[in-house]
Structure formats: C-alpha cells, structure tokens
C-alpha cells in the first residue's frame, strides 16, 4: 500500500468476508461499514452474518443491500449473468443496454435542461458511463427486501437505528443497525 506505510496504527490486509477463520481473527469493532458489496459475494446472507459478527456490543453496522424488486431483479440477474458469461455476452449486453442508457440520459438532459452527464460525476463520484458498466458487470447479484434484512439482523441482536430505502425501485436499501 502507498498510504500510511510506516504508520503503526494503520494496518492494511486483504481478506474475504466469507472466510470465517479470517473474520474471527479480526476482533470486534465499534463501527463496521460495508456499503453495497455484500450482495456481490454469491453468499449474501453469510456475508451479512459475518460482517455483523465483527460489531461489538453497542457498536454500529452500516450496510447497503440491493432492493428486491421481484421480476425486475430476476431480469437484471439474467442480464448481469449474461454480461459476465464471456465476451459474446458482454458484447451483446453492451450493444443493447449502453445505447438505451445513453438515450435515456439524453432525454433526461433535455427534459431537465441540464447536462446529466456532467452533473452525474459530481453527485456519484464516477462518470455515468463507468457507472453503467459497473452496473452491468455487478455479479454475483443478490437482493433482499427491507423486511428480510431487518428480521435477519434483529434475530442476531441488532436494532434498526436508521434506514433509507430505494422507495421500491432499483438500488440499495441503506441500513444502520446498533448491536444491543
């Protein structure tokens, strides 16, 4: 790592949230933050459980998990699987969806009388084009309802402190839990 190389209070490691032995070696923390990645592990519920196991009593867990939209989520799961299946799938999905995304963004720019391409990077931290490819390539792709995440963590001794939902749409439901 190039940051804090000689800092004795800064440790950088590489590990998997699915590796229980690695997780058990880390200890407990006041804050555990996993924003929009646990649903890309292929074992989302195990990943959530392992992340939660790192939170000490009275500690806080911040997670963001893709909202389950039923058929729409199933559709995107198929699209993403095809995109990640190899070069043919990647080209096919790119040829279908990137023009669709571009047209949608151009229409939005015209209706809002704003350049959504320029505004996007300021608000999201990445270019809109990069985000489109990031969305298409986000595999594995798992989803959960607000209720499922709430009950799963409630059963593990967590209280919901705050929530921001995707309002039933595409995107992440964002949760803040406190361990009792």
Predicted regions and their residues:
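Core SAM-dependent methyltransferase catalytic element
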Residues: 156-180
């Amino acid at each position: 790592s190039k940051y804090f190389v000689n800092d004795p209070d800064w440790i950088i490691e590489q590990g998997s949230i699915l590796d229980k032995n690695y997780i058990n070696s880390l200890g407990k923390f006041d804050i555990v933050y996993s924003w929009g990645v646990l649903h890309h592990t292929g074992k989302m519920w195990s990943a959530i459980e392992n992340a939660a196991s790192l939170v000490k009593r009275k500690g806080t867990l911040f997670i963001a998990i893709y909202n389950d939209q039923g058929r729409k989520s199933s559709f995107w799961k198929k699209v993403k699987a095809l995109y990640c299946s190899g070069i043919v799938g990647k080209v096919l999905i790119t040829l279908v969806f990137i023009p669709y995304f571009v047209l949608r963004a151009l229409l939005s720019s015209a209706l809002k009388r704003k350049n959504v391409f320029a505004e996007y990077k300021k608000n999201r931290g990445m270019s809109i084009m990069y985000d489109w490819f990031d969305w298409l390539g986000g595999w594995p792709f798992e989803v959960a309802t607000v209720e499922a995440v709430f009950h799963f963590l409630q059963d593990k001794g967590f209280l919901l402190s705050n929530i921001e939902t995707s309002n039933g749409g595409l995107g992440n439901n964002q949760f803040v839990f406190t361990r009792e």
